[in-house]
Amino acid sequence: VRIGLIQQNYLVGDLSGNREKIFRAVAEAPAGVDLFVTSELALQGYPPRDLLLYHRFVERSLEAVETLAQKLTGFAPLLLGGVEFGSAPKRLHNCAFLLHQGKVVQRFRKTLLPNYDIFDERRYFEPGQGAQSFLLDGQKIGVTICEDVWAGSPEVPFYDLNPVGELRGVDLMVNLSASPFVRGKQAKREMVLGDAARALGVPTFYANQVGGTDHLVFDGSSFALDGTGALLGRAKAFAEDLLVVDPDLAPQRIEPKLGSEEEVWRALVLGVKDYAAKCGFKTAVLGLSGGIDSALTAVIAAQALGADQVTGLLLPSPYSSPGSVADSLALAQAYGIKTTTLPIGPMMVAMDLALAPSFEGLPNDVTEENLQARIRGNLLMAFSNKFGSLLLTTGNKSELSVGYCTLYGDMSGGLAVISDLYKTEVYRLCHWLNQTQGGKIPEAILTKAPSAELRPGQTDQDSLPDYDTLDAVLHHLIEERKSAAETAAQGFDLPLVERINQLLSRAEFKRQQAAPGIKVSTQAFGGGWRMPIAASKTLF
């Protein structure tokens, strides 16, 4: 049995467009494929979120299934990811439809519904009653959907039921998946599916979605394993593909597994590219400060959209160093990004004069510093509005964690490109770009001390610990969900950890007003981080 794994980039909610895309993949495939398999919820695009709460959307989804089945008359069978109504009007099933000879031949319902991190499937779906199978050319094929194969994994120790165990006796297993990218995820997928293949002793096929959807990026990398868990084939990463594998033959096309920095780079580029395209933007604008964060964001945008579609605004104040302007211009010239320079000194004076009667007798403090950031935010938004460009924010995860950012200032924008990269990860990715990818980020940007330049001689370490320490502590508090005491036990000073933990808690109100950011870590801010705002600021 030759299996064709359809790996496509879908637009969420575009039922007719996604349907036609799937049809073309089948119609244009090479001859000899016995079964085609899409990713999970391919017809709707994953995740459809609260579109699923609209009865008419589900009705139209089912109509699209019937239409596709009819159009595929004469082609090989297709396992299609979609939804169907459940036991009650507002309960649904996440399912796979087997389409053949113009009809829906069989339905397979997802059993395990993830309800952690960015997954919220119990909000919409009710579980199926265990894994199922069907016969094709005398072969018994087991069907699972994404989470169904993760029950035995230490990654998700939540389930008593293991659908894979119910498939003993099948000749092969397929898994329709929509698994978002995080750093190192592909190795875990191949390990988990390898365990399933060995448990059943049969070839196992995994079809994944590809492309950016809001804050998520799906990396594709669909694959097939033999009954020992050895790789038979792997599709491209971060690109559409059709992987055709015959489990009776020797290993076939195996696309290379990407290194840690390259996979993050490609995830961020695809995330920006698809977010812009799917939201209707062709151009982007961002502030260029001469620092490493805006440099990396600009380089990602240039790669994603084309350098000629990116505008960098230089917004120097009286506190900006000459090097900041020069370094920004050098970066822009190296990458072909057009720039506009708008000094904000006159606007700072106007603001100070307007506020002087109210602030008389009070010393300057962070208020005046934040006014500079908000002046810049207004100018950036003006360019975004006037030219219809997507405004990219340039803050990193370290800053967003501890609130070292200004609401309605540098946080203004439509997409927070590097908000899931700690500062140390920003440096590492930039060095990787320059050393291995022919990157042209000026050395001065890589070596200067980080600074917001909101007062004379300011550096980030006036307010924060060194980034090596800060990021290590934050990783324990955020990704590993450790308490302050547990984190300090890893070799950190307890008062320092408690201070960082308090900053993390106090900044929650900022994070919940931040632009969506592209998830690349196991614990990003956004949909998978659900912390209270009006709560004790020393939670643990």
Regions found by a protein language model. Give the residues of each.
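Enzyme catalytic cores with a strong preference for nitrogen-chemistry domains
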Residues: 1-287, 303-307, 314, 334, ...
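ATP/NTP-dependent adenylation/nucleotidyl-transfer catalytic domains that generate, transfer
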Residues: 202, 227, 253-290, 294-540
